[in-house]
Regions:
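Soluble non-cytosolic domains of exported or imported proteins
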Residues: 34-38
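Gram-negative outer-membrane assembly/targeting C-terminal domains
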Residues: 248-265
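Short, conserved active-site entrance elements at the starts or edges of catalytic domains
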Residues: 125-160, 181-186
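Acidic/charged, solvent-exposed loop-and-adjacent secondary-structure segments enriched in E/D, K/R, S/T
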Residues: 107-133
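N-terminal mature ectodomain segment of secretory-pathway/periplasmic proteins
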Residues: 39-114, 141-152, 265
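C-terminal segment of classical bacterial N-terminal signal peptides
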Residues: 14-28
């Protein structure tokens, strides 16, 4: 049961590319003015390949390994334009935890808590994180960004940006001073076992078909400890549409959530 509680938190906080025990240092005093948040976002877009490269693709698949507290398994992350996602973590001897968004319905399944249709802030976050061209088009979710300090994350100098969403949530993103790329985030997610403030760290960017992709994702939270996702496969434009279909276990629950669903087509 404890294992699946941790997996519930992992699944709830995953859908990005985030607490106690995070490697953040105290803010570093600046001798110069902080760059505007919009400029940091623009620099990130260029640093990962540019708008044209991002918009040249319509889907992506990542595959690799997952490790947490002596437990290991496999992970696959599927995403597609304009806003679809599916994440599945399989652990031998325990089973598979899955989460998805088909452009309208957000859902997750695990062996302990069963199938669930997402609503409210959980659905809003999943919609935002499923935006395939993120950060392009993020204005539909974000009402403001502000650079608040120069600090450190994962032994890197980063600019800390406070983000406010249209549903009045505030969270932080961190942009690498040297490379310009997104280095991580801190955000609170709602899980089946309560809220979890989660630090996400992005490492090991590699160029794939003109786009730079982080191949290592580290997540830390007080509730779930540390999880490390290492991807060995990254490919664009090879994902079948059927991957994003709502599972049979979820369909009976969809009627109760349709009033909060939104289409991105």
């Amino acid at each position: 049961m404890k294992m699946w509680k941790r997996m519930s938190i992992i699944l709830a906080t995953w859908t990005t590319a985030t607490v106690a025990g995070s490697p953040l240092a105290q803010g570093i005093a600046l001798a110069q003015e902080l760059p505007p948040a919009a400029a940091l976002v623009d620099r990130h877009v260029e640093a990962v390949g540019g708008r044209a490269a991002l918009e040249s693709h319509i889907s992506r698949r990542l595959a690799g390994s997952f490790e947490t507290q002596g437990i290991s398994g496999t992970v696959e992350v599927f995403s597609a334009a304009p806003a679809k996602s599916r994440i599945q973590v399989q652990i031998p001897g325990f089973g598979t935890v899955i989460s998805g968004y088909d452009g309208r319905i957000g859902w997750r399944i695990n062996p302990t808590f069963g199938p669930e249709v997402l609503e409210g802030r959980s659905l809003d976050q999943l919609k935002q994180n499923s935006n395939f061209y993120n950060p392009l088009g993020s204005e539909r979710f974000v009402v403001s960004r502000e650079t608040v300090e120069l600090t450190e994350l994962d032994e890197r100098s980063v600019y800390k940006v406070e983000v406010t969403t249209r549903w009045d949530e505030e969270y932080f993103k961190f942009y690498d001073v040297e490379t310009g790329r997104l280095a991580g985030s801190i955000r609170t997610y709602t899980t089946p076992v309560g809220e979890a403030e989660t630090t996400t760290i992005l490492r090991d960017y590699e160029e794939v078909d003109g786009v730079w992709v982080p191949m290592t994702w580290v997540q830390r939270s007080a509730a779930a400890g540390e999880q490390v996702f290492k991807f060995t496969t990254a490919e664009f434009d090879q994902v079948e549409e059927s991957v994003f279909e709502v599972p049979a276990e979820i369909k009976p629950l969809v009627k109760t959530a349709e009033s909060s669903a939104e289409t991105y087509d």
